[in-house]
Amino acid sequence: NIEGESSYKKYDVNFSLDRKKVKSISALGSLDFTEARPKIDVAVNLEEFQLDAFSPLGENVLSKIRGIASGNFTLKGFLRNPDMDGDLVLENAGLQFPYLNTDYDFDGNASVGLNGQSFEFRNINLIDTKYQTTGFLEGTITHQNFDLWSLNIDVDTPNLLILDTKNTE
């Protein structure tokens, strides 16, 4: 349900999407279009939400985002670049860095914090899908308007495939 006032500039949001009889995403809050820059104030709950829907957001920085997410977070602020606040647990997750030609699975459940415009990865055990080398990932992936992306990632490893490109002159 999304209901608007008579001005059609403010909306109450009460939304859910069921997948296989599980409410995989629900959102409750408001959208406000009364100012030049629309605002959002929504609480979101994910339960076994398929992450592959987010792959297009990563464009050429991240791809093949996969796995399922569960957790709660809020979206507040300007609609095009809201602040996020919350925590997610990822299962059977992984992602690819096309520029590095590397693809990783997250071993076990992974904890990801949402803070501002950043996704905070917390001591995640990585396994590269090509050679099965391992390492630990911590750091942030930050966006601006879900368009400009930056990585601030630390990888602790004695043996993890970091770059898998061909040498060209």
Model-flagged regions — what are they?
Residues N1-E169:
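Interface amphipathic segments
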